[in-house]
Amino acid sequence: MKKLAIGIDIGGINTAFGLVDEQGEVYAESVISTRKYPFVEDYPSYVADLSEALHTLCNELQFEYELVGIGIGA
């Protein structure tokens, strides 16, 4: 079974994220707007939208895999 990790890069304009293997090959990637959530009160909505986007991305893969880690950069 392929082992994949989630990578997330939180930027001031967009949050980019993807699924990569141990060799760094990217299997899927996407972005959501970070600017859509300018206030601390928007944080729960940001996390919910990011979580939904990650679930969608993971469901697009057409093979079995194991999530073994997550990395977040900001």
Residue ranges and their predicted role:
Residues 13-15, 53-54, 68-70:
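Short amphipathic alpha-helical surface micro-motifs
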